[in-house]
């Protein structure tokens, strides 16, 4: 089957979001342009890494290329709305790529479908016919800053960590290794 690359050159929206309750959330990245919406499933850690690397890339393009990169998210780009429904997974993300397109002055994010084998780096940010399906999104530096800020909020919106061991607290409590397995009540979850 031929490779499918979903390209969003001027997305109306590109966001990280979740479906489900903290502790049982599924993470998605969703791109929308006109009437077309694509959602891909992604691991929480991948969202965190993408936000971190994107912030680093924005700093680098500001210093190396003199691009106009806002330090804070412009008010008109703050997006707190839920994911567009229905949320239908196109694929699960395996490899991710980031780049800077100097011609269009856009950050490029590419999300490749997970595969059983290793992904050749040559297919990342390339239009070769062989390789995993992909979503490629072009963002202005301001939109990239907004995406990274929302992604951080989404990642950190889960269960609160135990103040002793750092493991996530469940509403029913949690068995804390720092307390020799003593079950901490959910009151600890309500503190802090």
Residue positions per predicted region:
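Positively charged, low-complexity terminal tracts
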Residues: 1-192
């Amino acid at each position: 089957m031929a490779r499918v690359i979903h390209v969003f050159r001027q997305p109306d929206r590109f966001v990280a979001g979740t479906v489900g309750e903290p502790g049982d959330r599924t993470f998605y990245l969703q791109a929308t342009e006109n009437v077309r919406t694509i959602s891909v499933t992604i691991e929480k850690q991948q969202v965190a890494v993408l936000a971190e690397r994107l912030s680093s890339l924005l700093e680098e393009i500001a210093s190396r290329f003199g691009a106009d990169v806002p330090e804070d998210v412009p008010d008109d780009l703050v997006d707190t709305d839920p994911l567009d429904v229905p949320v239908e997974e196109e694929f699960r993300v395996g490899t991710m790529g980031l780049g800077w397109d100097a011609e269009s002055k856009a950050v490029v994010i590419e999300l490749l479908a997970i595969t059983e084998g290793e992904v050749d780096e040559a297919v990342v940010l390339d239009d070769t016919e062989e390789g995993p399906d992909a979503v490629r999104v072009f963002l202005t530096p301001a939109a990239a800053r907004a995406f990274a800020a929302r992604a951080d909020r989404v990642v950190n919106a889960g269960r609160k960590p135990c103040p002793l061991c750092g493991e996530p607290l469940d509403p029913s409590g949690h068995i804390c290794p720092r307390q020799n397995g003593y079950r901490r009540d959910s009151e600890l979850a309500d503190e802090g």
